[in-house]
């Protein structure tokens, strides 16, 4: 029977057994290499509360930075599809690997894929 994906939906190569993690959404036990992992960083308080805290802070505002919450989320495949963290892709598109964020030091012409065009002729994003 033909394989649906090159990696069979897992990141495990020649390891034998992979550890398990719990899905953040439903609690299902899923292998660590198969789980869809996302790293989330957010402010501890919302924007309006943050503004109030900074205005009423006793010390210099330049010395104070609000702490952030850093959470590593891991989802099972069904929850990741349901929450639209990953989407169902066609057979050709499954072969393409991509990252969710572009790096900051990439030039604008490289982001659009028109590296041969000069910067002035590029469409405005």
UniProtKB/Swiss-Prot annotation:
PROSITE patterns: RIBOSOMAL_S26E (PS00733). GO terms for biological process: translation. Signal peptide: none annotated. InterPro entries: Ribosomal_eS26, Ribosomal_eS26_CS, Ribosomal_eS26_sf. Keywords: Ribonucleoprotein, Ribosomal protein. One of its GO terms (molecular function) is structural constituent of ribosome. Pfam families: Ribosomal_S26e. GO terms for cellular component: cytosolic small ribosomal subunit. Belongs to the eukaryotic ribosomal protein eS26 family. This is Small ribosomal subunit protein eS26. It comes from Sterkiella nova (Ciliate). The gene is RPS26.
